[in-house]
Amino acid sequence: MTLNCIGIRAEQNRRKWTMTSIMRLAAFIACVLSGGFLIGYLNVPGSWYAGLNKPWFNPPKWIFAPVWAVIYLLIALAGSRTWERHRHGIAMRLWLLQMALNFLWPPIFLSAHLPGFALTIILALFVVILASIARQWSSDRISSALFVPYAAWVGFASMLNLSIVHLN
């Protein structure tokens, strides 16, 4: 048996696509992407954010939408896989918790203008993402791998949030 780069046997990784699994995946993609776009639409950085002192590594505004679109797609793929394998388990509860924290951060930071409180939310999100990766690793490495870019981005966003708290 051959192993791929993240240690999954190719023979065990094959899956049979059914209409149910395709519809579930489509539902996860639709819900996560539409939720993310709605949160982004309702919490646009305005004059308050523009007036903040920001660190030198603050990315340009245009980068956030495409990065989050890709990350939300990865989150949806992982969510669909998790639902299929661990619908009532801890892994699915962690997935739901990370979605709640993910959707909570923008209104707290961008609309309520509470970067300190937002920092606690994003740090909790980061911990939950790491817990999700660890929890899924033994049973579904693909779901774990799908969360790695998400963890990297939220880690970066946490440093950005911390820097904004420190500089303001």
For each feature predicted by the language model, list its residue ranges:
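N-terminal membrane topogenic signal
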Residues: 14-30
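Alpha-helical transmembrane segments of multi-pass membrane proteins
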Residues: 32-47
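Membrane-interface helix termini and inter-helical loops of multi-pass transporters
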Residues: 44-58, 166-167
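Membrane-interface loop-to-helix entry segments
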Residues: 59-73, 113-125
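Membrane-interfacial loop-to-transmembrane alpha-helix junctions, especially the N-terminal start
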Residues: 87-95
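Membrane-interface helix caps and helix-loop-helix hairpins in membrane proteins
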Residues: 107-117, 164-168
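Membrane-helix boundary connector in multi-pass membrane proteins
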Residues: 109-115, 131-144
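Final/C-terminal transmembrane alpha-helix of multipass membrane proteins
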Residues: 146-165
